[in-house]
Amino acid sequence: MFHELKQSKDFLALTLAHPQYLSESFEFDLGEHTHVEVWDTGVIVFSPKQAKHSKDIVLSCAVHGNETAPIELCNALITQILSEELTLAQRVMFLIGNPAAIHNGTRFIDENLNRLFNGAHSRDEGLCNPERIRAHKLEQYVDRFYASQSGERQRIHYDLHTAIRGSKHEKFAIYPYRPGRKYSREQIMFLESCGVNTILFHHEPTTTFSYFSSENYRADAFTIELGKVFPMGQNDMTRFIAMKEMLTLLMTGKDLQLPEFDLKRLNLYQVCRSVNKHFDDFEFNFTNDVENFTAFPKGYTLAKEGGKAVKIEHEFESIVFPNAKVPVGQRTVLMLKTADDSNLD
């Protein structure tokens, strides 16, 4: 496998050739400058040997296997590093979240992987399916990556996705709930420079991958939506040039040249509530082609279930991630209201 990767420099191909696991981990050096470790299928770590690094960066993709643009983006960056076109100045771990689902061409195999972090994988039925086992392993890899360095360091985790539904804001990011910690203006402007100018501030703990890293390691973590789902090879990668350029600057230690914080360049939303499904007959009162961030007025009947109406409570609320087909007990939609910059640092 070592020789296969050294020759092809295609980490995605190696991962998809071994979607369940690698028979052994391996490591090697790139010249005199970078140490490379492959811990498992879809798990590769790059550590600068010479540079005095101060950041530990996790870039994850394919937590949902059919969200292909982030997979192609991450694999392109990995190939550039393995080809020594990029010399890193910071530690970086790339995670290809659900190789079996990529191989299958589906969002997941048995269960939504991004509902299984922060220990959720071991609740109820326990480690009973591929996603639960993978979530447990991914948590261990993140812990190992962050815990191996001591002292004052910045921990970053960008979990990259694409959305099933069209959106009034093509690219947006979810900033996990972080009680007692203000949100970072610098991180928000980094995302704005990546072409992600819409930020959702979450209102409660969740079981997402980004929340896991934020809560347990105080990482600057985000779930980042980069547009709409397309089949592998059919993504217009020119739409991700800014993201790739900024990630390259971050990893190689170059000056990010971030603009001053400017509210006029941003769309800020506060998640005001989650609407969970309580009955099998849950249905939305809008068509399937309604876009993310569509706003509805107070009193509008958003959905119906169990003979009762779910109504809009604030003057206006916007929707994101509506999905009536989730199992009973899970979230069907996040409701948003506009936010200001009062909770930013």
From Swiss-Prot:
One annotated GO molecular function: hydrolase activity, acting on ester bonds
Annotated EC: 3.5.1.96
Active site per UniProt: E225
Pfam family, one: AstE_AspA_cat
Cofactor(s) essential for the protein: Zn(2+)
Binding site for Zn(2+): H64, E67, H161
Pathway assignment: Amino-acid degradation; L-arginine degradation via AST pathway; L-glutamate and succinate from L-arginine: step 5/5
Superkingdom of the organism of origin: Bacteria
EC class (word): hydrolase
Chemical reaction(s) catalysed: N-succinyl-L-glutamate + H2O = L-glutamate + succinate
Cofactor binding, note field: Binds 1 zinc ion per subunit.
One GO BP annotation of this record: arginine catabolic process to succinate
Keywords assigned: Arginine metabolism, Hydrolase, Metal-binding, Zinc
Gene3D superfamilies: Zn peptidases
Keyword Hydrolase attached: yes
PANTHER family assigned to the protein according to its UniProt record, in alphabetical order: ASPARTOACYLASE (PTHR15162), SUCCINYLGLUTAMATE DESUCCINYLASE (PTHR15162:SF7)
Family affiliation: Belongs to the AspA/AstE family. Succinylglutamate desuccinylase subfamily.
Role of this protein: Transforms N(2)-succinylglutamate into succinate and glutamate.
Name of the featured protein: Succinylglutamate desuccinylase
